[in-house]
């Protein structure tokens, strides 16, 4: 590789999620592996003018390529970073210690057990959880546990000599067992058991027990206690939703696929003993017009059946694409491996979340690859040439979304010379039209958007109308009737009709509503920018429509009850532990809430029941 690494173009494609990055030199050798809570922020730091050290300068000078693997938590990134360092032994990494010196979380065997970090021999009485990749991972986990399960983390010397609780008790990070009377033995023991289960990966048992306690507290009308337990349940759920380590110690290969602009990315996550060991993105050569199913099927067959990967076959392969010959593939792999290999395409639970992670990484890698091949500037330049324009400095695109004509929303997205200008994206609620009339919806949104004064810098060079000839005719009619102070003839109106079976790459473009349109090659940078802005508009419209539909569906019945304002609504939900608790309450129980009369309680009761 002799080309200079384009850091600016690369950083535009990097996500702000946690993950791991690998840096390669001109020979394709991994020279550094790192992890980050925010990949974009961390990687940007390498390309500043004032670098922190000569080592970093020497490293950056040799970078020819960077791969990133997105993870869902920083802890997962730490584990993955460690596995990559062990695998590649990069010369710019400090090599970590071997497993025998790794830190553990220690739950002591004291009367009031404490949590702490432990290294070395395991002589002390208590339980050890780990090992963790480094001390930072342990400290991060301890801080998390302290927020959810407030058992003590202080040294025994401090614990034995306190006469009043410390600041940790005041801010809710410790139950204060050091001072008699602050917490019962039963409650402290219960929280210790939650910690034990949580660190053992038994999150479901923790949630089951907490939910049972919350329901009992609600039945006993101990609403403050129920609310505290509810907050604890929510905290546990927030954490467990982000954990992607299987309790079953599974051996899996998880294959996610992304396809865009004539290019495919197949991302494989390798999971052994329930832990993500690493991942890799593959970019198979895809002839024009190839179906995505064929891409996946061919790749999987070559990847596993050519022999080099056979000895690493897992017990299960997860795919995010439903293969027509799934059974044949599974039988062939099983025969080669001498044991049963399962191929799943619709997994649930942890497996579904692994698949989502693989899909996320595939999409991220593909975005980076496409960006490296053709930047947004190059694409806009190519489109300007196709449209015979001197330049395209601003481009706007419209789309309509509704369900059976209801909750119609129009979207407008804006691109400038640097790509998406999300601060200027707009949604328009469409009203006063015949349900399902997309032409009327397009007519309305264009009049609202352009039937007023517009700054010179915000007049678009191109207006893309998603929908083909009919929608383009509406746009032409609207612009013909506009009476505005700006040059309404400046924007070029361009219609785009989806191809047969709505396949990307087969779009037809129209300058006029009459006559034949024209198409661009699937690998055309001009077509890629059209697809990009159209997809952004489509997603923006659908997002707005879903929010509007959800608002109608989920508007609390309480908001429609006369006499129940925001303060009373908040009081009701607080005392009843949420809307479900209120629905289950009797008139007498509702009337006990401060500020709620017997008459209003009856009105609330019957409104919720009917």
From Swiss-Prot:
<dbReference type="Pfam" id="PF02151">
    <property type="entry name" value="UVR"/>
</dbReference>
<keyword id="KW-0227">DNA damage</keyword>
<dbReference type="Pfam" id="PF22920">
    <property type="entry name" value="UvrC_RNaseH"/>
</dbReference>
<dbReference type="InterPro" id="IPR001943">
    <property type="entry name" value="UVR_dom"/>
</dbReference>
<dbReference type="Pfam" id="PF01541">
    <property type="entry name" value="GIY-YIG"/>
</dbReference>
<protein>
    <recommendedName>
        <fullName>UvrABC system protein C</fullName>
    </recommendedName>
</protein>
<comment type="similarity">
    <text>Belongs to the UvrC family.</text>
</comment>
<dbReference type="GO" id="GO:0009380">
    <property type="term" value="C:excinuclease repair complex"/>
</dbReference>
<comment type="function">
    <text>The UvrABC repair system catalyzes the recognition and processing of DNA lesions. UvrC both incises the 5' and 3' sides of the lesion. The N-terminal half is responsible for the 3' incision and the C-terminal half is responsible for the 5' incision.</text>
</comment>
<dbReference type="GO" id="GO:0006289">
    <property type="term" value="P:nucleotide-excision repair"/>
</dbReference>
<comment type="subunit">
    <text>Interacts with UvrB in an incision complex.</text>
</comment>
<dbReference type="InterPro" id="IPR010994">
    <property type="entry name" value="RuvA_2-like"/>
</dbReference>
<keyword id="KW-0228">DNA excision</keyword>
<dbReference type="InterPro" id="IPR001162">
    <property type="entry name" value="UvrC_RNase_H_dom"/>
</dbReference>
<dbReference type="GO" id="GO:0005737">
    <property type="term" value="C:cytoplasm"/>
</dbReference>
<dbReference type="GO" id="GO:0009432">
    <property type="term" value="P:SOS response"/>
</dbReference>
<dbReference type="InterPro" id="IPR050066">
    <property type="entry name" value="UvrABC_protein_C"/>
</dbReference>
<dbReference type="GO" id="GO:0009381">
    <property type="term" value="F:excinuclease ABC activity"/>
</dbReference>
<feature type="domain" description="GIY-YIG">
    <location>
        <begin position="16"/>
        <end position="94"/>
    </location>
</feature>
<dbReference type="InterPro" id="IPR000305">
    <property type="entry name" value="GIY-YIG_endonuc"/>
</dbReference>
<keyword id="KW-0267">Excision nuclease</keyword>
<feature type="domain" description="UVR">
    <location>
        <begin position="204"/>
        <end position="239"/>
    </location>
</feature>
<dbReference type="GO" id="GO:0003677">
    <property type="term" value="F:DNA binding"/>
</dbReference>
<dbReference type="Pfam" id="PF14520">
    <property type="entry name" value="HHH_5"/>
</dbReference>
<dbReference type="InterPro" id="IPR004791">
    <property type="entry name" value="UvrC"/>
</dbReference>
<keyword id="KW-0963">Cytoplasm</keyword>
<keyword id="KW-0234">DNA repair</keyword>
<keyword id="KW-0742">SOS response</keyword>
<dbReference type="InterPro" id="IPR035901">
    <property type="entry name" value="GIY-YIG_endonuc_sf"/>
</dbReference>
<dbReference type="InterPro" id="IPR038476">
    <property type="entry name" value="UvrC_RNase_H_dom_sf"/>
</dbReference>
<dbReference type="Pfam" id="PF08459">
    <property type="entry name" value="UvrC_RNaseH_dom"/>
</dbReference>
<dbReference type="InterPro" id="IPR036876">
    <property type="entry name" value="UVR_dom_sf"/>
</dbReference>
<dbReference type="InterPro" id="IPR003583">
    <property type="entry name" value="Hlx-hairpin-Hlx_DNA-bd_motif"/>
</dbReference>
<dbReference type="InterPro" id="IPR047296">
    <property type="entry name" value="GIY-YIG_UvrC_Cho"/>
</dbReference>
């Amino acid at each position: 590789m002799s080309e200079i690494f384009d850091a600016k173009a690369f950083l535009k494609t990097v996500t702000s999620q946690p993950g791991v990055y690998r840096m390669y030199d001109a020979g394709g050798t991994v020279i550094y592996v790192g992890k980050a809570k925010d990949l974009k922020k961390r990687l940007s730091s390498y390309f500043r003018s004032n670098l922190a050290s000569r080592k970093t300068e020497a490293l950056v000078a040799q970078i020819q390529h960077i791969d990133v693997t997105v993870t869902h938590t920083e802890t997962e990134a730490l584990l993955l970073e460690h596995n990559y360092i062990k695998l590649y032994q990069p010369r710019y990494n400090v090599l970590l210690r071997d497993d025998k010196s790794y830190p553990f979380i220690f739950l002591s065997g004291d009367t009031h057990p404490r949590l702490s970090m432990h290294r070395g021999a395991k002589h002390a009485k208590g339980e050890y959880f780990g090992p963790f990749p480094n001390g930072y991972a342990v400290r991060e986990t301890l801080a998390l546990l302290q927020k959810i399960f407030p058992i003590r983390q202080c040294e025994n010397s401090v614990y034995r000599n306190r006469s009043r609780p410390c600041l940790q008790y005041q801010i809710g990070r410790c139950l204060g067992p050091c001072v008699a009377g602050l917490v019962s033995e039963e409650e402290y023991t219960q929280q210790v058991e939650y910690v034990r289960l949580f660190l053992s990966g038994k999150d479901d048992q923790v949630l089951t027990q907490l939910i049972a306690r919350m329901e009992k507290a609600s039945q006993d009308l101990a609403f403050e206690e129920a609310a505290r337990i509810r907050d604890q349940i929510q905290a546990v759920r927030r954490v467990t939703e982000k954990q992607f380590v299987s309790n079953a110690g599974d051996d899996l290969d998880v294959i996610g696929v992304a396809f865009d602009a004539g290019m495919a990315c197949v991302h494989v996550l390798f999971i052994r003993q329930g832990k993500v060991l690493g991942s890799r993105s593959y970019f198979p050569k895809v002839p024009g017009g190839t179906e995505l199913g064929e891409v996946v099927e061919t790749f999987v067959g070559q990847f596993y059946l050519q022999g080099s990967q056979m000895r690493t076959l897992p017990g299960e392969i997860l795919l995010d694409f439903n293969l027509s010959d799934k059974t044949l593939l599974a039988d062939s792999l099983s025969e080669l491996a001498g044991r049963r290999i399962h191929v799943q395409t619709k997994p649930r639970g942890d497996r579904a979340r692994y698949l989502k992670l693989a899909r996320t990484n595939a999409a991220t890698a593909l975005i980076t690859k496409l960006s490296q091949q053709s930047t947004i500037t190059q694409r806009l330049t190519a489109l300007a040439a196709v449209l015979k324009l001197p330049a395209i400095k601003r481009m706007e695109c419209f789309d309509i979304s509704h369900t059976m004509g209801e909750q119609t929303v129009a979207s407008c997205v804006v691109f400038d010379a640097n790509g998406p200008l999300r601060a200027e994206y707009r949604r328009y609620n469409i009203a006063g039209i015949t349900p399902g009339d997309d032409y009327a919806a397009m007519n309305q949104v264009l009049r609202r958007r352009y039937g007023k004064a517009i700054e010179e810098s915000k007049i678009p060079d191109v207006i893309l109308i998603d929908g083909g000839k009919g929608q383009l005719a509406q746009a032409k009619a609207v612009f013909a009737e506009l009476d505005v102070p700006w040059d309404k003839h400046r924007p070029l109106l361009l219609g785009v009709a989806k191809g047969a079976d709505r396949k990307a790459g087969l779009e037809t473009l129209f300058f006029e509503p009459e006559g034949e349109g024209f198409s661009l090659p699937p690998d055309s940078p001009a077509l890629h920018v059209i697809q990009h802005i159209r997809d952004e508009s489509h997603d923006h419209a659908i997002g707005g429509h879903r929010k509007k539909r959800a608002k109608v569906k989920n508007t609390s019945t309480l908001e429609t009850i006369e006499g129940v304002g925001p303060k009373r609504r908040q009081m009701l939900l607080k005392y009843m532990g949420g809307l479900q608790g209120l629905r289950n309450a009797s008139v007498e129980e509702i009337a006990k809430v401060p500020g709620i009369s017997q008459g209003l309680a009856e009105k609330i009761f019957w409104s919720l029941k009917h």
